Amino acid sequence: MIQQIEITLTPKSRGFHLVTGELMRQLPKLPKTGVINIFCKHTSCGLSINENADPDVRTDMETIFNRLVPENRPEYEHTLEGADDMPAHAKSTLSGVSLTIPITDGRLNMGIWQGIYLCEYRNHGGARKLVVTIIGE
């Protein structure tokens, strides 16, 4: 069985947001065994799996990414869409825009402390569209 759907995440402020619940509420029933691929259709945000318990992790991730790719650098040429745009593209490349997660017994087989993050790199990114492909039996 192969299923593919497109879902939309609600707009988020800039930062790292735990979206596991929002994502799961929009998914069909998962197969007993398989894999799920989640692909983000945007170039200024990303997806990641990281700690789901301590919100300080999300704050620290934002700090780390902002230090790695600062805004307002004079060497940036792509600046028409604002100071946060070119850094958002670079950060998206660093985090990636897709995740593949195993499905076991009809559930995402992630660690107890793992959650799915939307990494929003724009100040006002808007709703984000994800293509979800489920392969399983």
Model features per residue range: what roles?
Residues 1-137:
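Active-site histidine-anchored catalytic micro-motif
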